[in-house]
Amino acid sequence: MKKLINTLNPTDVVAAIIKKDDFYLLAKRNKDKYMGLKWEFPGGKVEENETFKEALSREILEELSVNIDIYNKIAEERYQDSEINVILHYFICSLKNEDIVLSEHEAINWVKKEDFNKYDFVPGDGDITSLI
């Protein structure tokens, strides 16, 4: 059965650009998920009646089991393909604690900005790296 995409009302998605010293946290998507094994800045969908920052805090706690400090929004990008229609909202963040436990990703890496080109990013996230 073909999945229908609502092109009029994209879904808001938030992503955390988590920085520690000169490194950024990248997460490798689960192999069984859409765009599996690609790298991304972690985050997820904004739920009804949730602010972007509330959604980002919740998603990072669910996915990485850590709390974050959220600073400024640095970018917004729209992405649409045959499966999804989203507006991605990117925020600079830092970890409050470093006891990361993965629940939805295959792996994480701390990566220097100049090494981003070595990673196969999900669409959208790769474009944002030039703004960091």
Model-derived segments and spans:
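Conserved N-terminal beta-strand and adjoining loop/helix that marks the start
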Residues: 2-24, 45, 76
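Conserved hydrophobic "DFG−1" position in protein kinase catalytic cores
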Residues: 18-19, 26, 93-95, 110
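Conserved Nudix-box catalytic region and its N-terminal flanking loop in Nudix hydrolases
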Residues: 23-62
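Hydrophobic packing within well-folded, soluble alpha/beta domains
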Residues: 52-61, 73, 91, 108
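Active-site-adjacent beta-strand/loop module that shapes the phosphate/pyrophosphate-binding cleft
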Residues: 67-69, 77-99, 109
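NUDIX/MutT-family hydrolases
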Residues: 92, 101-132
